[in-house]
């Protein structure tokens, strides 16, 4: 059965954990959907995971639209969220609404995700009022990498903690139905979650939230460039793929592929 906002809020009310995976193509989305993953995020993390960039800043609106369309073709039930890339919603309210609307119309995703807190609250309010569900994202926000300097835990210092509370409340009050907390101390994430009517999804925010999100390539061990502390690999996918490719190379070079059975008479 197709998952919608009501399904997700029902899980929150019943204390059932929500699963989310960031993925970018038809096949990985299809696999996620077939095993019952609740939400798929077409994240701007495709900048690092798919494009091989050092950060997410180069991802374009057209790339998000392209990859979200690919994902949607593989999905029957999962709730698909499209990430709005850097500078697609920061220039002006008018341009932001236009771009978010374009993503929803062209991809048929169910929601958009925006990074930031108080500074985007007015936009979140506007989008929700015109029928575009919004996922917020606070804590460590990759689009602010040039401000942070490097990935870091946000909320250890008193001023960071206070700002995070303000940003979280601003998003919730503006109407964000879901808020992602990234790289936030467990006790602070728990505090925000306990007082929230929004769905709270963690990534490096401990277990006291409504659900968890990880990147597909991290879960299956395909991405080897770096491994954040919060990542749990469930498969050493890169090793398995390399072994298969090596065996293909050996068989071709040794004249063992193709066989008679793999050839047309």
Swiss-Prot record:
Keywords from UniProt, A to Z, are: Cytoplasm, Magnesium, Metal-binding, Pantothenate biosynthesis, Transferase
**Pathway per the UniProt entry:** Cofactor biosynthesis; (R)-pantothenate biosynthesis; (R)-pantoate from 3-methyl-2-oxobutanoate: step 1/2
What SUPFAM superfamilies does the entry give? Phosphoenolpyruvate/pyruvate domain
For the biological process aspect of GO, one term held by this record is:
pantothenate biosynthetic process
Q: Which GO terms describe its cellular component?
A: cytoplasm
Q: Sorted alphabetically, which InterPro entries does this protein's record hold? A: Pantoate_hydroxy_MeTrfase (IPR003700), Pyrv/PenolPyrv_kinase-like_dom (IPR015813), Pyrv_kinase-like_dom_sf (IPR040442)
Report the protein name in the record.
3-methyl-2-oxobutanoate hydroxymethyltransferase
Q: Which gene encodes it?
A: panB
């Amino acid at each position: 059965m197709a998952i919608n906002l009501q399904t997700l809020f029902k899980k929150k009310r019943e204390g059932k954990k929500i699963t989310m995976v960031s993925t970018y193509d038809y096949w990985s989305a299809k696999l996620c959907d077939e095993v019952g993953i609740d939400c798929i995020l077409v994240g701007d993390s495709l900048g690092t995971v798919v494009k091989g960039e050092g950060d997410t800043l180069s991802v374009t609106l057209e790339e998000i639209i392209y990859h979200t369309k690919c994902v949607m073709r593989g999905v029957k039930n999962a709730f698909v969220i499209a990430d709005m890339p850097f500078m697609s919603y920061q220039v002006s309210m008018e341009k932001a609404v236009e771009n978010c609307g374009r993503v929803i119309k062209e991809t048929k995703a169910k929601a958009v995700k925006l990074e930031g807190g108080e500074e985007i609250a007015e936009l979140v309010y506007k989008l929700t009022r015109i029928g575009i569900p919004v996922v917020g994202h606070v804590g460590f926000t990759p689009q602010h990498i040039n401000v942070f300097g490097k990935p870091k835990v946000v909320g250890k210092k008193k001023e960071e903690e206070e700002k995070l509370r303000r940003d979280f409340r601003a998003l919730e009050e503006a109407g964000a139905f879901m808020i992602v907390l990234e790289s936030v101390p467990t006790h602070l994430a728990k505090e925000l979650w306990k007082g929230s009517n929004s769905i709270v999804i963690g990534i490096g925010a401990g277990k006291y939230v409504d659900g968890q999100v990880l990147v597909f390539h991290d879960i299956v061990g395909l991405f080897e460039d770096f491994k954040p502390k919060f990542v749990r690999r469930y498969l050493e996918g890169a090793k398995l793929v390399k072994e298969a490719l090596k065996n293909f190379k050996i068989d071709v070079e040794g004249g063992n592929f193709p066989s008679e059975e793999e050839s047309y008479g």
